[in-house]
UniProtKB/Swiss-Prot annotation:
GO terms for molecular function: monoatomic ion transmembrane transporter activity. GO terms for cellular component: mitochondrial inner membrane; mitochondrion; nucleoplasm. The gene is Sfxn4. Mitochondrial amino-acid transporter. Does not act as a serine transporter: not able to mediate transport of serine into mitochondria. Largely restricted to kidney, brain and heart. The modification N6-acetyllysine is found at residue 173. GO terms for biological process: amino acid transport. InterPro entries: Mtc. Keywords: Acetylation, Amino-acid transport, Membrane, Mitochondrion, Mitochondrion inner membrane, Transmembrane, Transmembrane helix, Transport. This is Sideroflexin-4. Belongs to the sideroflexin family. Pfam families: SFXNs (PF03820). The chain crosses the membrane at residues 87-107, 141-161, 175-191, 230-247, 269-289.
Amino acid sequence: MEPNLQFWISERQAFFRRFCQWMDLLDPVNMFISIGSIEKSRQLLFTTEDAPKHYLDNQVIKDAWNKSLSTVHPDSSKLIPHLFRPAAFLPVTAPMVFLLMMPDTGIKSIILTQGCLYGYTTAFNITNGNASYSHGPVERTLLGAGVSVSSTFIGLIPHLFQMKYPPNNFWLKRTLPIVFLAQVSGMNVFASRSFENHRGIEVMDKEGHVVGHSRKAGRKAIKDTAKSRAVLFGTSALAPELFIHIFKRTRFYPQTLLSLVILRMSSTFFMMGLMVPVSFSMFPQIGQIQCSQLEEKIQSSTEEKELFYYRGV
């Protein structure tokens, strides 16, 4: 069995432990791990008996797991491209969210930032989603292009609306783009990973033996990931607005434009740094579903009451 898949099946731990694991996996250093180092770490995991059980009590094994989990896809056993590894998500998206939430930004700047943000998140979702369904590179490329363009267009709606009908209410002006950012980010996951819902993903027993392909499991995997992504971007954009609004009422509020920009940037980066591991930890990487909730063909092919599937990041 693929070591990463074996690890996530055996490690269905509580939220706090998942959070601590993601804090390790999101270390930016993991973007630059060499292929040789990855192969050496995975060889150690292959040759170590019950390697998942030694994650906490053996530092060498723990380091090997962190290198493997942060760079290799659990479904395909292929290396994840450097730019789309989980560790790259925060440093790539945080500056975009900051620029997107800057007040009084021109429409050209908004279009460029939206395009970059949704172009990246679409590719990230496809790369780190479940890869057990049948697919080809051309159809995935066409799907990704369509999703990124449509997400960018939908994300522009509140900005275009405010340009034509400027709202008098401050909170409506500032929160409407945030609501759209959260909603479109969730919809982006649904759209970019729609093949999982239409074609089904592998469901397996606790030993990792594949029982069949389930569209219902694919739908659940996408739904959970979409929720976490909406929470991530919605909270990361809303919290700095609340902080700055409250801070304005104090005597410590800076008056220079540069100080205001630095304050907004710091609060946005802080919230993104907190919410990325929180959102990735909201649901286990290996989802669990009752066999009775799946298709009749799968129910008739196994006696297991609970089956597992890879949710994706």
